[in-house]
């Protein structure tokens, strides 16, 4: 094989690796959206790199390090399999789709950055309904922008840093 052909082959392989990396990052965000909607927070936490320099920043706080992120989702929010959660989640639906993606993988193939617009809605049932009271609750449009950095962690793509910027939240009605 000629030197020129060998260089072209190496470049093609690097490009394929970066394309595969981009798809892996897209899949992480798809899983994030799905797990969030399904309240599958135990699985959601597995999407994160097992690192002390991870962070998750959103309107309700900032969590630094994988242990803090685990605490956010497994203690503060809980998981659908937790005792009593089936009753707490009854009538609740939070769906945040990922849209308008911009995603770039670094030349070295070890990190990537992306952002997504997230058109979402959140429906929360009213608490403490009185006997005979018609079920009701809050339904809101809740749009945001996700800024996410990914890192290859032990050979697997994982979420490294995530920031959620709220764009607007308003009543569905």
Regions found by a protein language model. Name each.
Residues 123-128, 169-173:
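A short, polar/proline- and glycine-enriched secondary-structure boundary/capping micro-motif
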Residues 20, 61-64, 138:
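A structural signal for alpha-helical segments
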Residues 23, 93-94, 139-141:
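Transmembrane beta-barrel outer-membrane domains
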Residues 1-34, 38-42, 46-47:
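Short, low-complexity N-terminal intrinsically disordered segments enriched in polar/charged residues
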Residues 111-115, 136, 141-173:
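Short beta-strand edge/turn micro-motifs at domain boundaries
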Residues 28-31, 43, 99, 145-149:
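Short, hydrophobic/aromatic alpha-helical segments in well-folded domains
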Residues 41-123:
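A solvent-exposed, acidic/Ser-Thr-rich amphipathic alpha-helical stretch
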Residues 126-136:
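Short, surface-exposed loop/helix-turn segments at secondary-structure junctions
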């Amino acid at each position: 094989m000629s030197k020129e052909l060998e260089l072209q082959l190496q470049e093609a392989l690097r490009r394929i690796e970066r394309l595969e990396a981009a798809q892996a990052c897209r899949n992480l965000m798809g899983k994030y959206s799905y797990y969030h909607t399904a309240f599958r927070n135990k699985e959601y936490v597995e999407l994160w790199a097992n690192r002390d320099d991870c962070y998750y920043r959103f309107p309700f706080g900032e969590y630094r390090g994988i242990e803090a992120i685990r605490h956010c989702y497994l203690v503060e929010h809980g998981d659908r399999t937790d005792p009593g959660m089936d009753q707490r989640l009854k009538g609740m639906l939070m769906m945040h789709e990922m849209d308008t993606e911009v995603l770039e993988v670094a030349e070295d193939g070890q990190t990537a950055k992306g952002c997504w617009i997230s058109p979402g809605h959140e429906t929360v049932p009213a608490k403490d309904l009185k006997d005979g009271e018609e079920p009701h609750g809050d339904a809101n449009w809740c749009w945001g922008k996700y800024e996410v950095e990914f890192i290859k962690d032990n050979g697997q793509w994982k979420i490294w840093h995530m920031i959620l910027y709220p764009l607007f939240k308003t009543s569905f009605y």
